[in-house]
Swiss-Prot record:
It comes from the Eukaryota. ANK repeats lie at residues 26-55, 60-89, 93-125, 126-157, 161-190, 194-223, 230-260, 264-293, 297-326. Coiled coil: none annotated. Residues 354-373 have a biased composition (Basic and acidic residues). PANTHER family: ANKYRIN REPEAT AND PROTEIN KINASE DOMAIN-CONTAINING PROTEIN (PTHR24198), ANKYRIN REPEAT DOMAIN 55 (PTHR24198:SF188). This is Ankyrin repeat domain-containing protein 55. The modification Phosphoserine is found at S475. Residues 7-16 have a biased composition (Polar residues). InterPro entries: Ankyrin_rpt (IPR002110), Ankyrin_rpt-contain_sf (IPR036770). It holds the Pfam family Ank. SMART domains: ANK. Residues 1-20, 319-339, 354-375, 454-476, 564-614 are annotated as: Disordered.
Length: 614
């Protein structure tokens, strides 16, 4: 009984089946190795025993034919094709044997597969044809072979990223491939999913010859102002990347708009200044670009150059601002306007008296004989200030002289002047001495809203939207602020607001100034002049509101964190695989308040408590 109860292991069991499965896996592995290594004899013997091995796939869906292509085994490929291998079978990524051969740049294998009936119009899971992959290879023959088999629709086929073979040729910096595709009918006006044309990618590659090839196409000039998803044109990309030679190449096209605006109203000059590309800044200025255009933050290119600390760009932009001529308003006469002096009001009064006497003298010359010299104190005052007013007593346009009549009181006391009808409207302002731009340091980034010169007529108009021509350094402003106590002690008719910066002459009062103060019994209202703010961030006013200049004594100032915008959001991979592709070039970071959260602002505010004291 005990013998019958013993278990019999001689019969086949599950272990024997598993052992058989493992042996089959080992056989397939040997087949794949023989195909990739070119072992024709071993591969032939195995396939003769079981022809179904030709259709077997590994974990990635690759057949023995694909392994032979990966190993660049031409004889093995021919053998497998003769034995009946499926030439158009796709792997797990949708790639055929021809697609793999093209990715590898294997010209002999591609020719062999095409001659044996391989289809060149089967896209992979990324939507790319073998023609897309051929643009990455420096050998032109591979692309030429595929173009001979392709029609127009296949040449302009767009992958899942919306990129055509022409896009990829420009992306891979292949001028000859680009020229060949254009000759075969590639459309340069097609855009990818980011609204980029092939010219955008050519500009990013930094190859001027490649850009000129696309622009020489009959449709090239029509795409020069195409903007991508962020509103950037080819000029924006060239300026941000520092390709000044490409900027000149693009500017040769008459349709090129050098002052195109992106979604944040930034010009190419804004991006060049923010990126610190001095050569591009100089090139754009030489091409006549306006340096005073503002973006949505009311910031000029000079403001971004100051903010980012690019001194070379600051010098170029500040020189451009200083060399701009001050143009009078259209209503003014064409005669050059005279500068407003401190004694301009008194000068207009006395000059009017002189002109009236000159006109009367011209009408009646005989009056000169019997006329006695006027020894009044008014004439003494005229003589005293002749040396000060200089040439201001020359004839001025009649519409610029205030028509005010005065009553003269003849008494032994000192004479004074009173307005008869209305107060005298002062047209000038005390002189504001322009200073050079402040030095750029890491801890002191000044912003200036604008450096455009404004005439005195413009200062008398309603709300100001532009700052003064230049801006004092912080040390000099502190020095002037310490003198405000002395200013309040002076009985000065030109009393200014605490935010206004005057020249050094305002702080010293002579005897002639005191005499002038006694003469002006009715003081005209003072007009305020906004001073460029010393801000460490770019102010972004809400939409629909005018830009207002902030006082230097503002209590709360928030620093904006830097943000970066990727210039090439395409997948980065070797042989154009499914992994995301990255580019080396990133556009400069210009802070924008559109994407900043409140938490980020509060954290930046707490990290920089000293900025609130400014």
């Amino acid at each position: 009984m005990m013998r019958q109860a013993t278990m019999d292991f001689s019969t086949p069991s599950v272990f024997d089946q598993q052992r058989g499965d493992s042996s089959e896996e080992v056989d397939l592995t040997m087949v794949y190795q023989a195909a990739s290594n070119g072992d024709v004899n071993a591969l032939t013997a195995v396939i003769r025993e079981d022809p179904s091995i030709l259709e077997c796939c590994d974990s990635e869906g690759c057949t023995p034919l694909m392994h032979a292509v990966s190993g660049r085994q031409a004889d093995t490929v021919k053998l497998l094709l003769k034995m009946g291998a499926n030439i158009n079978m796709q792997d797990a990524y949708g790639r055929t044997s021809l697609c793999l051969a093209t990715y590898l740049g294997w010209l002999e294998g591609c020719v062999s597969l095409l001659r044996n009936g391989a289809k060149h119009n089967i896209p992979d899971k990324n939507g790319r044809l073998p023609l897309h992959a051929a643009t990455a290879e420096p050998d032109m023959r591979l692309l030429t072979v595929l173009l001979q088999q392709s029609n127009i629709s296949e040449i302009n086929h767009q992958d899942n990223e919306g990129m055509t073979p022409l896009h990829w040729a420009a992306f891979h910096n292949q001028p000859q491939h680009t020229q060949m595709l254009l000759k075969k009918g590639a459309d340069p006006t097609l855009v990818d999913k980011d609204f980029k044309t092939a010219l955008h990618w050519a500009v990013q590659s930094g190859n001027r010859i490649l850009c000129s090839i696309i622009l020489s196409h009959h449709q090239g000039p029509s795409i020069i102002n195409y903007d991508d998803e962020s509103g950037k044109t080819c000029v924006h990309i060239a300026a941000a990347a520092g390709f000044s030679d490409i900027i000149h190449e693009l500017a040769r096209v008459p349709e090129c708009n050098l002052q195109a605006l992106d979604v944040d109203d930034r010009t190419p000059l804004h991006w060049a200044a923010a990126a610190g590309k001095a050569e591009c800044v100089q090139s754009l200025l030489e091409l006549g670009m306006d340096s005073n255009l503002r973006d949505i933050n009311e910031s000029t290119p000079l403001a971004y150059a100051l903010y980012c600390g690019h001194t070379a760009c600051v010098k170029l932009l500040s020189q451009e601002s200083r060399t701009e001529p001050t143009r009078p308003p259209p209503s003014q006469s064409s005669r050059p306007q005279k500068k407003e002096r401190r004694f301009n009001v008194l000068n207009q009064i006395f000059c009017k008296n002189k002109k009236e006497e000159q006109r009367a003298h011209q009408k009646d010359p005989s009056r000169d004989r019997y006329r006695e010299e006027d020894t009044s104190e008014v004439n003494d005052i005229i003589t005293t200030f002749d040396s000060i007013v200089g040439t201001n007593c020359q004839e001025q346009p009649g519409d610029q002289v205030a028509m005010v009549e005065f009553k003269k009181k003849t008494s032994d006391n000192s004479k004074y002047l009173l307005p008869e009808k209305k107060p005298l409207a002062r047209k000038g302002l005390p002189p504001i001495r322009t200073q050079s731009l402040p030095p750029i340091t890491l801890g002191n980034n000044f912003l200036t809203a604008s450096h455009r010169a404004t005439s005195h007529a413009g200062l008398s108009s309603a709300p100001h939207h532009m700052a003064q021509r230049s801006q004092k350094s912080r040390s000099e402003q502190d020095l002037l602020n310490n003198r405000t106590g002395c200013q309040m002690l002076l009985d000065n008719p030109w009393k200014s607001d605490s935010n206004q910066v005057f020249s050094y002459k305002v702080w010293t009062v002579s005897s002639s100034d005191k005499l002038l103060d006694r003469l002006l019994s009715v003081r005209p209202g003072h007009q305020e002049v906004s001073v460029p703010p010393h801000l460490r961030h770019l102010h972004n006013p809400s939409s629909g509101q005018n830009f207002q200049h902030l006082s230097p004594n503002r209590h709360k100032i928030r620093d904006l964190p830097f943000t970066r915008n990727n210039l090439a959001p395409l997948p980065d991979q070797k042989f154009l695989s499914g992994e995301p592709l990255r580019t080396n070039r990133v556009l400069p970071a210009i802070p924008s308040q559109r994407r900043h959260s409140t938490a980020a602002e509060e954290s930046e505010h707490s990290a920089n408590p000293t900025s609130d004291e400014n």
